[in-house]
Amino acid sequence: HAGRTVAEQGAVIGKLFANFAAVAAANPLADRRNGFTAEQIAAVGPDNPFIGFPYTKLMNSNAFIDQSAALILTSVAKAKSLGIPEEKWVYLHGCADTYDHWYISDRKDFHSSPAMRVAGEEALAMADTSLDQIGAFDIYSCFPSAVQLACQELGLATDDPRGLTITGGLPYFGGPGNNYVTHSIAEMMNRVRAEPGMKGLVTSCGNYVTKEAVGIYSTEAPHKPFAPKDPNIYQSVLNADKGRASTEAANGAATIETYTVMHDRAGPSFAILMGLLDDGSRFIANTPEDPELLSEMVANDYMGAQGRVAQYPPDPPRAAAAAEFAGPAAVGEHRIFLHRSEEH
């Protein structure tokens, strides 16, 4: 999509996450305070292997932590009755939650998130503010793609001088399962309390970049009552905007749309790919355990590579797919084979 080589992409996302690692290095609550450099994050080695190509271990969320955070949500009246000082009050100015198509095969492409775009637009509109009026961000960072997609859809540069995290992000601060955003909101409360009137924006992301949410926080009281829009209003538009048709019985000429190569402790184990048939329909596949093929798919960009796909075994009732291109693929209960073509 971006037109980069494998090496160029590694360097770009290494630099992106080095900025997160630097924030974590200065955060006493962070789990990994090493301050990894872009080169350390991108370099593949025994201590930093690929998990799912093109992402190394240091580009993945770190769930091996022991962390907790808490928030108290209440009304102004209750806060007053409890005697909580007003300088500690933080208001939610704008919020929205959306989701992209649950089935990845239903999406128009794999380099955008309409749900994040809409969540950002709705939250900013509710808060009567704009991106240039936000003083601090914490962008959900389970993997580089989550950050890149959020920035793209929000209209935020990945090297914005305001920074993209206040904690250090999931790989370095820590990724405590579904609880990370509790930490980012709690830290954002500290930030806006330290700079009264400043607005902070927090994003969250779940599943396969599926569920998206945005919240905007400030110590300044909103100028209007808290009244978020019914999410069904904008979610129905997202639901109707489907991508191309998919097939579970892929046969014929095929092109790789996108892919990843999964690794175990021994190295590359299999690839998962989304492919297109000549009629434009999409299929899901994975490769056989072919070390030569998998090494090629890691060393070179195979997006757009062409070949053939057919089901395996060839006889019903449980046919799957056999072909000439890359190696076996699973679609539902089917097994699909893509063998390398001579052209690639």
Give residue ranges: language-model regions:
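Phosphate/diphosphate-binding loops
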Residues: 177-199
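Conserved beta-strand elements of the Class I
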Residues: 135-136, 199-201
